[in-house]
């Protein structure tokens, strides 16, 4: 009688094991959650902030306060979906050489009453073999 239950027990164990796997491993090309401290996420976030500041018509730089959420998708490279909080700084954009990310992060914030915080959604497409990143989507409010 024990032998007749064996063929049923093995597939059930396999099914249970598959259900316990993280969902991201089961969906090739699907979105996977990423740690906001992951070095690749940090690099994509730096790029997004740099691009935001170069595209923005605001007279002042915005710096990264925090990465709220990060996801990635395997495409021809990796696409990072980032939700970030940015804050307007006291550093004015002067004509000439624009500030780089690390310089912007060192900019002082205005007093609390004058602070302007944005929540931004960025999509950054990374293709490391081409040494190329591209901001494919951006929305801030």
Swiss-Prot record:
CDD domains: CY. SMART domains: CY. Inhibits various C1 cysteine proteases including cathepsin L, papain and cathepsin B. This protein has no toxic activity and its function in the venom is unknown. It may play a role as a housekeeping or regulatory protein. Residues 1-26 form the signal peptide. A motif (Secondary area of contact) lies at residues 73-77. It is found in: Secreted. Disulfide bonds join 91-107, 120-140. Belongs to the cystatin family. The record marks 29 as: Reactive site. One of its GO terms (molecular function) is cysteine-type endopeptidase inhibitor activity. It comes from Pseudonaja textilis. One of its GO terms (cellular component) is extracellular exosome. Negative results: the recombinant protein does not inhibit calpain-1 (CAPN1), a C2 family cysteine protease and legumain (LGMN), a C13 family cysteine protease. Does not provoke cell death (PC3 prostrate cancer cells). Residues 29-129 form the Cystatin domain. Expressed at a low level by the venom gland (at protein level). InterPro entries: Cystatin_dom, Cystatin_sf, Prot_inh_cystat_CS. It holds the Pfam family Cystatin. This is Cystatin. Keywords: Disulfide bond, Protease inhibitor, Secreted, Signal, Thiol protease inhibitor.
């Amino acid at each position: 009688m024990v032998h007749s239950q064996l063929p049923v027990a093995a597939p059930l164990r396999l099914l249970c094991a598959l259900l316990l796997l993280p969902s991201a491993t089961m969906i090739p090309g699907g979105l996977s959650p990423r740690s906001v401290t992951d070095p690749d996420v940090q690099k994509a976030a730096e790029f997004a902030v740099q691009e935001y500041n170069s595209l923005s018509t605001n007279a002042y730089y915005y710096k990264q306060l925090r990465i709220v959420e990060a996801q990635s998708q395997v495409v021809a490279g990796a696409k990072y979906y980032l939700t970030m909080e940015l804050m307007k700084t006291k550093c004015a954009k002067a004509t000439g050489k624009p500030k780089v990310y690390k310089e912007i992060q060192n900019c002082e914030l205005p007093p609390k009453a004058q602070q302007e915080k944005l929540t931004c959604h960025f999509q950054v497409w990374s293709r490391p073999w081409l040494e190329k990143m591209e901001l494919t989507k951006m929305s801030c409010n």
